[in-house]
Amino acid sequence: MNAPHMNDTAADAATLDDAAAPAGRPALTRREQKEAYENNKLFKRIVRQVGQAIGDYNMIEQGDKVMVCLSGGKDSYAMLDVLLRLRERAPIDFDIVAVNLDQKQPGFPEHVLPEYLKQVGVPFHIENQDTYSIVKRLVPEGKTTCSLCSRLRRGILYRVAGELGATKIALGHHRDDIVQTLLLNMFYGGKLKGMPPKLQSDDGKNIVIRPLAYVKETDLEKYAELREFPIIPCNLCGSQPNLKRAEMKALIRDWDKRFPGRVDNMFNALAKVVPSHLMDTTLYPFQSLRATGEADPQGDIAFDEEPCASGDDAAAPGAAQPISIVQFDDL
């Protein structure tokens, strides 16, 4: 799906249903008008960002059948909602099927998702698999079960995608999830690894996409409240929270408040990698590197804190002094 087309589609779709007072009702107050305006801005921003991500990474193509994985959380609800809006005006044809994995967690409200999906008119499939009992049997009480649960869920969803004939699997990870994963891998895994917007699945049979890759979590929280999605709690399994990921989430929230733009810069850095200025010998041929005699615009000069002084400035206090280069012929 080409980015320009998707952006046009996003612009066309970006009108919130209830942004104005319905006919026959009293005119909106100034406060209500302001809220409606802000809500419409939020919707337009999310739709634009989803459309841009889809276009940038060619996530959805003509004839695709997109399996939208719906957990009952705010992120997957928002992803489905926006994809449905975009599909209405997309320049290509693609199908959407919503899939939920009922893992038989105690207290899981089985009726919520089917009722919602019937209401919005989306084809859906509920996969019933008691992974909860497996996880409880294998993971000691009080430990985090998320990792094992995730692996089991992933394998089941890959199988279901094949059975349904889905060509793309859409997950609801957002910008904050991606940055959190980057930090977790750096701090605890010793590697530069994030969460890509598009990838081939572990089994090599599926393409996984993340249409919300450019969207902030705070925007999704506001959007879920605005759209009144029937949210299903994510702690029904009784698992202890992933403390390391919770730590990264709190760190990102704090940075967003105290240092606006910092998290965005970190996120943008994932798409602007300079292998010659890292240390991975598999990405850059350091061992065979030789001087070419030609200036490199991405060389070390890009990291100078300030330009070297010249002319009259050279003698100023604190100014950089010229360096004498001595030839050592006997070395």
UniProtKB/Swiss-Prot annotation:
InterPro entries: Rossmann-like_a/b/a_fold (IPR014729), TilS/TtcA_N (IPR011063), tRNA_Cyd_32_2_STrfase (IPR012089). Its EC number is 2.8.1.-. One of its GO terms (cellular component) is cytoplasm. It catalyses: cytidine(32) in tRNA + S-sulfanyl-L-cysteinyl-[cysteine desulfurase] + AH2 + ATP = 2-thiocytidine(32) in tRNA + L-cysteinyl-[cysteine desulfurase] + A + AMP + diphosphate + H(+). Keywords: 4Fe-4S, ATP-binding, Cytoplasm, Iron, Iron-sulfur, Magnesium, Metal-binding, Nucleotide-binding, RNA-binding, Transferase, tRNA processing, tRNA-binding. One of its GO terms (molecular function) is 4 iron, 4 sulfur cluster binding. Pfam families: ATP_bind_3. It comes from the Bacteria. A motif (PP-loop motif) lies at residues 71-76. It is found in: Cytoplasm. Residues 8-23 have a biased composition (Low complexity). Binds 1 [4Fe-4S] cluster per subunit. The cluster is chelated by three Cys residues, the fourth Fe has a free coordination site that may bind a sulfur atom transferred from the persulfide of IscS. Pathway: tRNA modification. Belongs to the TtcA family. The thiolation reaction likely consists of two steps: a first activation step by ATP to form an adenylated intermediate of the target base of tRNA, and a second nucleophilic substitution step of the sulfur (S) atom supplied by the hydrosulfide attached to the Fe-S cluster. Catalyzes the ATP-dependent 2-thiolation of cytidine in position 32 of tRNA, to form 2-thiocytidine (s(2)C32). The sulfur atoms are provided by the cysteine/cysteine desulfurase (IscS) system. This is tRNA-cytidine(32) 2-sulfurtransferase.
